[in-house]
Amino acid sequence: MKYDFSTLSPDDFENLSRDLVGAETGVRFEAFTVGADDGMDGRHAKADGSIILQAKHYLRSGFSKLKSKMREERVSIDELAPQRYILTTSVPLTPANKATLTEIIGPSLVGPGDIFGADDLNGLLRSYPEIVKAHEGLWAHSTPVLEEVVTNAVRKAMAPAEVPKTLARLMPPPGAADAPIEPVKRDTIFIIKASPIDDEFTLWLAPKLEAEGYQVFADVLTLMPGERWRREITSALRHRAVKVLLLCRDSSLEDSSIQDDLDIALETGKELGDQRFVIPLRMETFRKIKGLGDTVAVDFVRNWGEGLLKLIDTLQRQKVQRSIDTMINPNWEIYRRRGAVPIIEVPERLTSNWLRVAEAPDFIRYFECSGSINKGRLQGAIDSYGHPCALVGGSGFLAFGGVPEIEMAFEAVGRFKLKHEIPLVEFTEGGFQRLRIDRQIASNLVVAMLKKAWFNYCKRNGFIEHGYSNGIGFHASPEQAPTGKRIPWGNQAEKKRSSMLRNSAKGHIWQFGVTAMPAFWPFWHFKLKSRVLFAQDNDTPAGLVVDDPKKLHRLRRSVCKGWRNKQWYGRLLAFLELLSGESAFVRLPLSETETFVIEASPMLFSSPVSTVLPNDLDDEDEELDDSTLGRPDSDEEGGE
């Protein structure tokens, strides 16, 4: 198509000239704002001189006006003294016209070839079609060009999307529909799942199977799970699946797309003669699945790790081939990160549940009986002693007490002598070979003694002991923390705050408590684990204790669901306030003369980065909701 440039303003023509001549000569021209230009519409500076470009949009004035204007410009051109001068014009030029202009412009013009008339510019537009698209003033009023632009846009929008490479390599090769398909190696485990409920588990399971040498496919690998590539995924399953893992829960098995995929998998298994082609994975309890018969599902309800081991064992027993060359597909991680919280380079202060150890005894002592001794009587004497001890060997024990204290406490059992005084840190880090105690046993013995000291301290201060499956916790008694009472915590500098350790909700009384676990790495500290107990509200301060573990679990999931992190942290600080009283430390007696001192305030850590999530929950440090549950709409939640 030939353009006459009549639709362009003078500024538009200058811009077009810079782009065309710049593309043709391979140089970039500077652009200048509207106004006096000293004979320049574009300039390219070089060490040995400048290249000057001037554009003259004289279409309607014709060659005569252009010639007169160039005579006026001659003085400016000579003053600029460019190494090279280039002229563009919208006026059509003959060879004679160019010769006339060459004489007028003078020595700055290298030759007639540096004069671009309308025909020359049209030639450049044909050579650089992308410049045509960039200058819509050329074609905005041209029906043929507009039709071409719209047609190309529609064709591009309607073009079928390219199948993701991860999926494309599993599909049958293209060919005639009735052409026989060459048999290929079945080497891919397909996962049938519901989105998005099963995405997290799939992103956890698939890389671990690939690490074992299995090739795995699920729709999240396309980075667009769901219906987008359904037909292609079905084709790939028929073509390459060696096994199919079905994630089972009633809610997902009712999905029509899951049922369709399962039907295809069962049909494929029948064609292959593999009755165990589909391996169900139990994510929740589910009803019997038609077509799977009595197939036993691999259980992932209790523990994902145990389920993975059973699944790998199942695949090995069914002789599913593995490859040492299998690489973990990076798309698993790419999809997992799509919902990740962005990190920013701003430090953030973090709270913790660690209490730093401030003081500890220098030595632990080993006492041994000088004669024969009854172990039962020795254990009874240790229990009566009231401070931590640990039996070692047949006739001795470890303790922190001094010689006079031990002799007096154990005189009814036998005569004990101090055999070894061992540096405490050396003992926990290296054991004590003279007593045949290795490092791990030594560490365990000291941990047990420190736990005993914590238990004794909590009991003496009126806290209620409760045994959990993985430890002993202590809760404030109804006298220490009555139902609905706020326990103040914090110092005056950060304003005094308060939290509840006991309150009523959903017809039950909940009570907050703590389990303490001593640890030596990376430094000595106590780690606190929050606990919540429930009692049926029978109008008594303590209530009727709920002992059923399943009911306790349901109550924790429902009642504590509305508690935010700051509420949990506030309860922990309120508990420590009761535990330490007016002191900044908790002093655990290890003997009549030795104490183990831990700080009563949890440690603060600093992270070099933080997230962009908002943190506007400061008002919840002071519990405005009387139920402290963050669920004020519940009819059964009591207040003060």
UniProtKB/Swiss-Prot annotation:
Source domain of life: Bacteria
InterPro entries listed in its UniProt record: TIR_dom, Toll_tir_struct_dom_sf
Lineage: Bacteria, Pseudomonadati, Pseudomonadota, Alphaproteobacteria, Hyphomicrobiales
Keywords, comma-separated and alphabetical: Plasmid
Region Disordered, residue ranges: 613-640
Protein name per the record: Uncharacterized protein y4cD
Keyword NAD: no
Composition bias, Acidic residues: 616-626
Domain TIR: 184-328
GO biological process: signal transduction
Residue ranges crossing the lipid bilayer per the database entry: none
Alphabetized PROSITE patterns for the sequence: TIR (PS50104)
Organism: Sinorhizobium fredii (strain NBRC 101917 / NGR234)
